[in-house]
C-alpha cells in the first residue's frame, strides 16, 4: 500500500527549474532514496513534500490525503517527520529537552493550565518525559539525557536528530543527507540504525544522500535527479547499469 505519492510536481525559482515533473510512489514500510549531483533538486523535493515550499504544479498525496496546499504543521500532524542536512539542535538545552520539543504539536494543554501548573499539565509533562526517555533509549542515547548536545560526538548528534524525528511517532521519515560529515565507521553505524528504525517501527523512510555505499546497501528503490528531472529509478543494480545515471552522477561502476 502506498503512503506517499508525488504526481508530476514542479518548482521554479526565478525562472530556473528546480524540480520538473517529478513523480514517485513510496510504499508503506519501505526505504527509498533520492540521489543526484549538488543542485539537482533533492532538498527542494523534501521542502515541497513537507509544505515548507509550495508547488508550482502537480499534486502531493500522503496517507490518502491531498496535502498539496496544506501548511507544514498540518502535514507534520498527519505523521510526517524530517531531519536536515545541517544538524539543528538546541545546544542550550539538554538532550532530553531537545527530544521533548520535537513532540510540540502533540501537546494539548493551553497557556492558562501551563501558567497555573494544573494537574493535567503535570500529568502530560510526566508522560512527555517518559516518552522522551523511551525514544532516547531506542537509539541508545538515554545515558546522555542530561547532557548538552555540544558534548556529544558528531555521530551521536546525528543520532539525536533521528531521535527527535522519531518522537512524534511518524508514519514517514525523511532524512536529508544523514551521512553528511560522518566517518566510515559512523556511516556503517548509521546504516544499521536506519535498518533498525525501519524494521522496529515499521515506518517508511526516504533518504536524500550523496554517500553511495549507504544508499546502495539499504535502499531497495532509488530515484535519480539531474537538473531537477528524474533520469532514472529502480533497484541499486538497475541504477548501477543506467548509462544516464552513470554519466550524470555515479561515474564508473567500480565506484558503486
What does each of the following model-derived ranges do?
Residues 1-256:
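Glycine-rich phosphate-binding loops of nucleotide-dependent enzymes
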Amino acid at each position: 500500500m502506498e503512503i506517499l505519492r508525488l504526481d508530476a510536481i514542479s518548482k521554479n525559482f526565478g525562472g530556473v527549474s528546480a524540480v520538473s515533473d517529478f513523480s514517485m510512489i513510496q510504499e508503506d514500510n519501505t526505504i527509498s532514496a533520492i540521489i543526484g549531483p549538488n543542485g539537482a533538486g533533492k532538498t527542494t523535493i523534501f521542502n515541497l513534500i513537507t509544505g515548507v515550499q509550495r508547488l508550482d504544479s502537480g499534486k502531493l498525496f500522503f496517507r490518502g490525503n491531498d496535502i498539496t496546499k496544506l501548511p507544514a504543521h498540518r502535514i507534520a500532524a498527519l505523521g510526517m517527520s524530517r531531519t536536515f542536512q545541517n544538524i539543528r539542535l538546541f545546544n542550550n538545552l539538554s538532550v532530553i529537552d531537545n527530544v521533548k520539543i520535537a513532540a510540540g504539536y502533540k501537546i494539548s494543554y493551553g497557556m492558562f493550565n501551563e501558567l497555573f501548573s494544573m494537574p493535567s499539565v503535570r500529568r502530560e509533562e510526566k508522560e512527555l518525559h517518559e516518552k522522551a526517555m523511551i525514544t532516547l533509549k531506542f537509539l541508545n542515547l538515554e545515558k546522555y539525557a542530561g547532557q548538552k548536545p555540544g558534548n556529544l560526538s558528531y555521530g551521536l548528534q546525528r543520532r539525536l536528530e533521528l531521535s527527535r524525528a522519531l518522537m512524534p511517532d511518524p508514519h514517514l521519515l525523511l532524512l536529508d543527507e544523514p551521512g553528511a560529515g560522518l566517518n566510515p565507521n559512523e556511516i556503517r553505524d548509521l546504516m544499521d540504525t536506519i535498518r533498525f528504525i525501519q524494521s522496529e517501527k515499521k515506518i517508511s523512510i526516504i533518504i536524500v544522500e550523496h554517500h553511495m555505499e549507504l544508499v546502495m546497501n539499504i535502499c531497495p528503490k532509488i530515484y535519480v535527479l539531474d537538473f531537477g528531472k528524474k533520469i532514472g529509478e529502480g533497484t541499486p543494480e538497475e541504477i548501477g547499469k543506467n548509462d544516464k545515471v552513470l554519466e550524470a552522477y555515479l561515474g564508473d561502476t567500480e565506484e558503486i
